[in-house]
């Protein structure tokens, strides 16, 4: 999923375009779904609001109700569920890091899953310690969060009929 280019967009129009583009992202765009596996996604952003005492507190807001600007961190939460009548094996969830956002190192979560990343558009995956990229200077270096293009979670145990789980990650607006 590619978010439209933001060059030339300023103020509310630019922020609204980013929000609108993020909301158009279907749940787990590249999820490798098995028969009976349903995947949904939600995106939230942390905003500062005043509480009843007038103090500023951080609150998670659904992306539909919030504006985002460069530097804001968006949390993507994907829920997977086995709607089939049998246990599901080899359940894999793949989600792209949207263009104009950069993955926040160490933010991917998923209890009972193996988490791998791609730096080549989802063609290959590996753990962070094994991924490299070629820098602008032509030298190979270890990949970092902003280099990741996709995240893959592999559920390690069979997912029981009616069972579900969640995975998540954060990405900052560039």
Where are these regions (language model features)?
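Exported/extracytosolic protein signature
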Residues: 2-3, 29-174
């Amino acid at each position: 999923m590619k978010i439209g280019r933001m060059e030339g967009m300023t103020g509310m129009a630019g922020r609204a375009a980013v929000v609108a583009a993020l909301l158009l992202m279907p749940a787990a765009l590249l999820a490798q779904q098995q028969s009976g596996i349903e995947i949904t996604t939600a995106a939230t952003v942390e905003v500062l609001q005043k509480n009843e005492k007038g103090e500023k507190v951080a609150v998670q807001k659904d992306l539909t109700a919030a504006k985002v600007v460069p530097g804001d961190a968006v949390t993507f939460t994907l829920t997977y569920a086995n709607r089939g009548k049998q246990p599901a094996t080899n359940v894999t969830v793949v989600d792209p890091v949207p263009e104009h956002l950069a993955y926040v190192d160490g933010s991917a979560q998923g209890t009972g899953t193996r988490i791998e990343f791609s730096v080549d558009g989802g063609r290959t995956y590996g753990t962070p310690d094994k991924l490299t990229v070629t820098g602008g200077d032509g030298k190979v270096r270890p990949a970092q969060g902003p280099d990741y293009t996709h995240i893959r979670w592999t559920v390690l145990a069979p997912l029981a009929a009616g069972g579900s789980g969640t995975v998540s990650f954060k990405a900052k607006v560039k």
